[in-house]
Amino acid sequence: MLTSDLSNDLANPLPLAQALIRRPSVTPIDAGALDVMQAALEQLGFTCRRYPFGEVDNLYARRGTASPCFLFAGHTDVVPPGDDDAWRKPPFGAEAEDGVLWGRGAADMKGAIAAMVASVQRFLDTGEPKGSIAFLITGDEEGPAIHGTKAVLEALADEGETFDHCLVGEPTNPNVLGDTIKSGRRGSLNCTLTVTGRQGHVAYPERAENPIPALLDLLGRLLARKLDDGVPPFQPSNLEVTSVDVGNPTTNVIPAAATARFNIRFNIAHNGDALSDWIRSEVAKIDLDFDGRIEADIHVTGEAFLTPAGPFTTLLQDCVEAETGRRPALTTGGGTSDARFIQLYAPVAEFGLVGATMHQVDERVPVSDIETLTAIYTRILKGYFKDFPA
């Protein structure tokens, strides 16, 4: 049975989008958002399974067992709204006024999830698919992303579950609906460098071991390397230092330790292991003239990937163009998403709403964009099950 604030007319995406936004599902809190999704999908004939890991809950739903299987993927968790009083509309009020839907998650990405569900209802109204449709909805995308899509995919693989293509509903469009489809993403590596010395008075440097010169030397070596010139359609890889800290507000004390943090966004010319080895090799070249140590704490949060242009991406472009009049570009820029996990299991692309206000105060989207996105998703389902045989 559907929740009381959700219309039985699932072909209309707005009531479902509002019901989801009214759940304050700030990572890792679900607040009933997945219950709303499960109720809607069960009404459409999906078999639903929940996958709780740690503090996070996740939902996998499938309708049918035959191939090909088309997977919709997304997340119901949202970032905190910040100061509620700074919003023109309540962040979890889901008010629709003058053709605009307001609320945290409207753009990223509860509006797109509602469009996915509505598109399935509209598609099923025309007949049964020659294959299967599935949903993977996580509550851990905006957070560490450890207990979300990645963990569910691993569990599904252990159970023998497979799918053939995936569309993620991230807000890929920077300006207007139909701008861009994400056909790949850069990889991401985080590193914390720590040089440990010995604290002392600046007037007696012989009694101290200053870690700062060694840290600056190491950062200089890392920054001196041009990683690449870009690999189309990827932009050049970049290393950005994000902080340098010594925890020392004074001018007469040599600090005991110095720390720097940086991130590398890398294209398919690199992988996480090779970059990690390079960082460690540069660390090994630093010759400390005192009895200290240098540590590099490296975490690769995602590898670069690309879904090559082909029948799947062409289908997506054709359907977007048919509904918007714009031919979307296939791009790979921006941050990471859960597509970095999905690409290990099936070809994946991303297309959703306009992201201009995502994560901001007064997040909002035109209701007409949600309707158009529903029409695009419906057209994609029709084309997919017509042109992609088992």
Swiss-Prot record:
One Pfam family this sequence matches: M20_dimer
Residue numbers binding Zn(2+) 1: H75, D108, E170
EC code: 3.5.1.18
Pathway: Amino-acid biosynthesis; L-lysine biosynthesis via DAP pathway; LL-2,6-diaminopimelate from (S)-tetrahydrodipicolinate (succinylase route): step 3/3
Catalytic activity entry: N-succinyl-(2S,6S)-2,6-diaminopimelate + H2O = (2S,6S)-2,6-diaminopimelate + succinate
InterPro entries for the chain: ArgE/DapE_CS, Bact_exopeptidase_dim_dom, DapE_proteobac, Peptidase_M20, Peptidase_M20_dimer, Peptidase_M20A
MF-aspect GO terms: acetylornithine deacetylase activity; cobalt ion binding; succinyl-diaminopimelate desuccinylase activity; zinc ion binding
UniProt keyword list: Amino-acid biosynthesis, Cobalt, Diaminopimelate biosynthesis, Hydrolase, Lysine biosynthesis, Metal-binding, Zinc
Top EC category: hydrolase
Positions with a binding annotation for Zn(2+) 2: D108, E142, H359
GO biological process, one term: diaminopimelate biosynthetic process
Co-factor requirement: Zn(2+); Co(2+)
Note accompanying the cofactor annotation: Binds 2 Zn(2+) or Co(2+) ions per subunit.
Active site residues of this protein: D77, E141
Family: Belongs to the peptidase M20A family. DapE subfamily.
Function recorded in the entry: Catalyzes the hydrolysis of N-succinyl-L,L-diaminopimelic acid (SDAP), forming succinate and LL-2,6-diaminopimelate (DAP), an intermediate involved in the bacterial biosynthesis of lysine and meso-diaminopimelic acid, an essential component of bacterial cell walls.
Description of how the protein assembles with itself and partners: Homodimer.
Protein name in UniProt: Succinyl-diaminopimelate desuccinylase
Organism: Maricaulis maris (strain MCS10)
Gene designation per UniProt: dapE
